[in-house]
Regions:
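Peripheral interaction segments used for macromolecular assembly
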Residues: 1-146
Length: 146
């Protein structure tokens, strides 16, 4: 249940969020991030497939992780899909070369679990949901326009 120093965000996706009271807060569905600073602030979970309510968790609430659950301490902030759609994110964002041609999309990223700083992005040339698709590393120094 230890927290690694660095983590791929995809390692958190589809994990159930459990609080210190033992309540299941649903699956992690997306990151909460600050793209200009290349930093993850936390994540968003969906407590119920039937309700539109979503819960936002700060990165410093992370207390443990195993193969199926993420353990948190404290209370989440509650929001809805319409509000969260306005949150900026780079997940699934298109990547273009200097000539303006699309070369892929951001499929994942590696971040430091204590600071939230993103070390690099993983770019997929095709649909990242298809198993076995190739991914290549995009370092922050290669990004011209944030």
């Amino acid at each position: 249940m230890a927290i690694p120093n660095k983590l791929l965000f995809s390692d958190l996706l589809k994990h159930n969020v459990l609080c210190d009271s033992g309540v299941d807060h649903g699956l992690i569905i997306s990151p909460w991030m600050h793209p200009p600073a290349h930093r993850i602030l936390g994540w968003i979970s969906r407590p119920s497939a039937l309700r539109l309510q979503r819960e936002i968790w700060k990165l410093d609430q992370l207390k443990g992780i195993n193969e199926q659950e993420v353990y948190v301490k404290g209370v989440s902030s509650v929001s809805d899909d319409q509000t969260l759609e306005r949150f900026p994110t780079l997940m699934n964002a298109n990547i273009f070369n200097r000539n303006g041609q699309k070369i892929g999309l951001i499929a994942d990223f590696l971040f430091h679990t204590k600071t939230g700083n993103i070390q690099y992005y993983l770019v997929s040339r095709s649909n990242p949901l298809i198993p076995g698709t190739s991914r290549w590393r995009l370092s922050l120094s290669q990004i011209i326009d944030k």
